[in-house]
Structure formats: structure tokens, C-alpha cells
Amino acid sequence: MSDERIRQIAFYGKGGIGKSTTSQNTLAAMAEMGKRILIVGCDPKADSTRLILHCKAQTTVLHLAAEKGAVEDLELEEVVINGFRNIRCVESGGPEPGVGCAGRGIITAINFLEENGAYQDLDFVSYDVLGDVVCGGFAMPIREGKAQEIYIVTSGEMMAMFAANNISRGILKYAHSGGVRLGGLICNSRKTDREWDLISELARRISTQMIHFVPRDNIVQHAELRRMTVNEYAPDSNQANEYRTLATKIIDNEFMAVPTPLEMDELEELLIEFGILESDEQVKQLTETDKAAKESEKKQEDAEGEA
């Protein structure tokens, strides 16, 4: 199979939103349908493959390279581990917080995988990426034209929506140079008021779709405690069928958009309209977070310009 036919997708979302859980359950469902999948974990926590491999955390490329002396000394079989339904799994890894560039592991891992033929005979490559904003090394799958379809995991909570809007801003930045597109928002429900309507409206306003609404179900946590996906732990459950539905929607998805992220006042208006943003303190929190995010993006742009 040629590289041109491989669909390269990425899951982004606010920390703690359930991005890795949602992506692994969805990819497990896709594998059940016969799709050949490689997961590339792009989070220093190395938790992007644990439900597929039934382990606490897969040993990362950077850790293995440090043990061997250099990434060039590694064999592909040491890095890529097969899990549930023969899903191939890799964790890029990263340094301790505050020490070095966490995105460097992503760059190192992807280059190693490409050079050693890891992308052969695949239908999907999935990048599970840390970050409330798309910047630095964490933008690498987008910036370098690796991931072509982005799915943002969000919910009806204020900061999750703020992060989704920020991520769409990052996608827009690279849309014309790298060809990346937003495939849709995945609402990982937190059972907030009018959540379905709110995320559907957010999706409409940023020119995308809510590709699926994943209901909240305790069976997800029960499966996680056993380090399993719901599809493996309870294959006949309603929740497993929800992930199968989402998997089918992604497989069939042809709605790839260049997003139109909201300005801060537009996002505030939406949140006020749905009763999410009520107090002056909440408005202040959102404004300060937006300012910090933009300052972070500006610093990264300056650093990229100097590189």
C-alpha cells in the first residue's frame, strides 16, 4: 500500500478531556472493522496506547534511544508493539516537565518510523497529541504535513470549548501551507446543560461539524481500570456501539474544513447565550487564559523564525 492512500489523522484536546481514552476506543472499533492502524502517541505521559496494550505505559522511543545510545541504534521491532486487533503502537515520549522540548520526541519518533518503513501496509496512522493549543513540537504532525485530518475532543465545559477554539486557530495557521483540515468536533459528554446543542452550535460557528456525541457511561472507567478498551471489555454494550458509530463516521468522513475560529468576544457571546458564562470572574478567567495562550503562540512563532 502506498503512503498516499494512508489516512493520517490526529486527536487533539484539552488536558483531561478524555482524548486518549476516546481515541483508543474509537481506533479499537476501527480495527474491529478490519482497518490496519498505527497509533503514534505524542504525549510525554505515554498513555496513548495503554488500553490497546493492556499496560501502564509503553516504553517510549526516547527512553529506548537513551538506553541504546542513539535512536539510530534501535530496531523497529523494539519500538512498535502490536496490541488489540493487531493495532501497532508507538509512544514518542518526552523529557521531564520543564526540561527541554517535549515536542522533540515527536519529531524523533516520526522520523525514525518513516525511515524504517513503519508506515507500510496501513489504512490509518493516528497521532494522539498533547496540547490545549497547537504550537511548538506538538504542532509537528500538522506543521510537517503528517496529519491531514484533525479531530478535536471537547465537551460543554467552558475551558474545553476554549481549548477547541484555540486548536482550530492553530489548524487554520497551517491549513494553507500543509493542507491540514478539521474533520470535526467529538463531544465527550460531561453531562452539562444543553451540551449537544452547545457543541453543535460551536461546530457550526467555526465551520465544522460535531461528528459524534459520545454519552457519558461508567463502563468506560470500568474498562480503563482493567487497562482495556470498552470494545474489548464489554463488546455488546451500548457504549461500545457508540465508539463503533464514531469509528464509522470517521472512516466515511468527507467533510474536511478550514476552520473559522471565533474571536474572544464571539466565544464569550456563545457561552453567555447558553448560560455557561455567567459571572464576571468567569469572563476574567477566560480573557486571561486567552491572553496567555496568544503570548505562548507568539513566543513559539519567534522561536521558529530564529531556527
Swiss-Prot record:
InterPro entries: NifH/chlL_CS, NifH/frxC, Nitrogenase_Fe_NifH, P-loop_NTPase
One of the GO biological process terms: nitrogen fixation
Residues that, per the record, bind [4Fe-4S] cluster: C101, C135
ADP-ribosylarginine modifications at: R104
Region (Disordered): 285-307
Cofactor: binding comment: Binds 1 [4Fe-4S] cluster per dimer.
SUPFAM superfamilies attached to this UniProt entry: P-loop containing nucleoside triphosphate hydrolases
GO MF annotation list: 4 iron, 4 sulfur cluster binding; ATP binding; metal ion binding; nitrogenase activity
Record has Nucleotidyltransferase as a keyword: no
Gene3D superfamilies: P-loop containing nucleotide triphosphate hydrolases
Cofactor(s) recorded in Swiss-Prot or TrEMBL: [4Fe-4S] cluster
PTM comment text: The reversible ADP-ribosylation of Arg-104 inactivates the nitrogenase reductase and regulates nitrogenase activity.
Function: The key enzymatic reactions in nitrogen fixation are catalyzed by the nitrogenase complex, which has 2 components: the iron protein and the molybdenum-iron protein.
Name of the molecule in the record: Nitrogenase iron protein 2
Subunit and interaction comment: Homodimer.
Keywords: 4Fe-4S, ADP-ribosylation, ATP-binding, Iron, Iron-sulfur, Metal-binding, Nitrogen fixation, Nucleotide-binding, Oxidoreductase
Superkingdom of origin organism: Bacteria
Provenance organism: Mastigocladus laminosus (Fischerella sp.)
E.C. no: 1.18.6.1
KW Transcription (keyword) present: no
Family stated for the protein in its record: Belongs to the NifH/BchL/ChlL family.
Catalysed reactions, as listed in the record: N2 + 8 reduced [2Fe-2S]-[ferredoxin] + 16 ATP + 16 H2O = H2 + 8 oxidized [2Fe-2S]-[ferredoxin] + 2 NH4(+) + 16 ADP + 16 phosphate + 6 H(+)
Pfam family, one: Fer4_NifH
